[in-house]
From Swiss-Prot:
Mapped zinc finger ranges (C2H2-type): 191-213, 219-241, 247-269, 275-297, 303-325, 331-353, 359-381, 387-409, 415-437
Function: May be involved in transcriptional regulation.
Positions of the KRAB domain: 15-86
Similarity comment: Belongs to the krueppel C2H2-type zinc-finger protein family.
Annotated protein name in UniProt: Zinc finger protein 773
Keyword Zinc set for record: yes
GO cellular component: nucleus
Keyword Ribonucleoprotein: no
Keywords, ordered alphabetically: DNA-binding, Metal-binding, Nucleus, Repeat, Transcription, Transcription regulation, Zinc, Zinc-finger
Gene behind this protein: ZNF773
Any one Gene Ontology BP term: regulation of transcription by RNA polymerase II
Source organism of this protein record: Homo sapiens
Location of the protein in the cell: Nucleus
Molecular function (Gene Ontology), one example: zinc ion binding
Predominant location category: nucleus
Length: 442
């Protein structure tokens, strides 16, 4: 890096808003994610402070105060900037006012000429319709890449782009400006939460954080009445009502209303699973899925059935269970019209019509239509009999066999013949008995 001393500002004419602004269109602004917009807000504040210290902003206190207390950093602040411009804060301000503030800066030799072009003669103030001004200091180094990337509005907000502070300003500055800049670069956090002790570098971040403790949600959607703790979340939510989906997947063309949703979706194509369970090492595509999975290890069951009090780890499991009480059977077989309460039950039933038997016994090669049938069959090979009769101590390989056996002890005969009213302990016995009435058995 070669040191280059800037020309005497007094020889460079007037500084206008065009000299210290980069524009984004509304479309370009949408390409920025929340983190980039937050960085934009932070550097806006720094640039305002710098311009004020150089005597280039007559309404220093008002503008800086607005930015410091700016509650929502994710929305464009061109209203603040424009109001200052229209009042003539910069228009016609001579660069010689900052002559005693001149400094030596580190500039790549290949970019010295380009860097000096910032300080050319007076240009008329001209507001570009529909574009968002992003302030930058006339002492901020601009890389060629940053200037070329204005079309997409991405590198302009990266750490290597136009918003990165690459120079230390020397000379006399106001006490407030120096203190603000020192805190900005040193990463100091003066605003502390009285509830949890977490500290923040800027007041608006503390205000937003405190809503976690108070539960305050001051932003209401005018369409559906839903409340939000942050204005940015409200703006993102409102896209649902407009139907706008500006974020498109380059792999499959699917569109999303939020950039975060697009990022999550792209993991389907990349196979990325960044969320890993610390207990078993299983990886997941979404953090919410990991949170749900973790309940398997902790045993947490936060969802309770209001009818019977049974607890569930997942809300989806509770909803399925509640169909036992409501009798709801939303899944219908298109072949025979039979209804089922669970989709998995319909899938299993469908194999009756298709004849599909996807489950094979590794011991004898026999196929089954349901995995439960295969599991029961395997006990024939293993000799396992986990079901014990409490009356006589006899063991059975299947629970259904135990239930049938227990009727010997209870005397239960649940199967009735409609012809003669006779009862039977097993359905197979009833089937045989019916043949007497049909004439099959003489």
């Amino acid at each position: 890096m070669a040191a280059a001393t800037l020309r005497d500002p007094a020889q460079q004419g007037y500084v206008t808003f065009e000299d210290v602004a980069v524009y984004f269109s509304q479309e370009e602004w949408r390409l920025l994610d929340d983190a980039q917009r937050l960085l934009y807000r932070n550097v806006m504040l720094e640039n305002f402070t710098l311009l004020a210290s150089l005597g280039l902003a007559s309404s220093k206190t008002h503008e800086i105060t607005q930015l410091e207390s700016w509650e929502e950093p994710f929305m464009p602040a061109w209203e603040v900037v424009t109001s200052a411009i229209l009042r003539g804060s910069w228009q016609g301000a001579k660069a010689e006012a900052a002559a005693e503030q001149s400094a030596s800066v580190e500039v790549p030799s290949s970019n010295v000429q380009q860097h000096q072009k910032q300080h050319c003669g007076e240009k008329p103030l001209k507001r570009q319709e529909g574009r968002v001004p992003v302030l930058r200091s006339c002492r901020v180094h601009l890389s060629e890449k940053s200037l070329q990337s204005r079309e997409v509005g991405k590198d302009l907000l990266t750490s290597s782009g136009v918003l990165k502070h690459q120079v230390t300003h020397t000379g006399e500055k106001s006490h407030r400006s120096s203190k603000s800049r020192e805190a900005f670069h040193a990463g100091k956090r003066h605003y502390k939460c009285s509830e949890c002790g977490k500290a923040f570098g800027q007041k608006y971040l503390l205000v937003q954080h405190q809503r976690l403790h108070t539960g305050e949600k001051p932003y209401e959607c005018s369409e559906c009445g839903k409340l939000f703790s942050h204005k940015s979340n409200l703006f993102i939510h409102q896209i649902v009502h407009t139907g706008e989906r500006p974020y498109g997947c380059s792999d499959c063309g699917k569109s999303f209303s939020r950039n975060a949703d697009l990022i999550q979706h792209q993991r389907v194509h990349t196979g990325e699973k960044p969320f890993t369970c610390s207990e078993c090492g299983k990886a997941f595509r979404h953090n919410s899925t990991l949170v749900q999975h973790h309940r398997i290890h902790t045993g947490v069951r936060p969802y309770e059935c209001s009818e019977c009090g049974k607890l569930f780890s997942f809300n989806s499991s509770l909803m399925k269970h509640q169909r036992v009480h409501t009798g709801e059977r939303p899944y219908k077989c298109s072949e025979c019209g039979k209804f089922y309460s669970h989709k998995s039950s319909l899938i299993n039933h469908w194999r009756v019509h298709t004849g599909e038997r996807p489950y094979e016994c590794s011991e004898c090669g026999k196929f089954f239509s349901q995995s439960s049938s295969l599991m029961q069959h395997r006990k024939v090979h293993t000799g396992e009999k986990p079901f014990k009769c409490n009356e006589c101590g006899r063991f059975f390989s299947e629970n259904s066999s135990l239930v049938k056996h227990q009727r010997v002890h209870t005397g239960a005969k649940p199967y009735e013949c409609r012809e003669c009213g006779k009862f039977f302990r097993h359905s197979s016995s009833l089937v045989k008995h019916r043949r007497i009435h049909t004439g099959e058995i003489q």
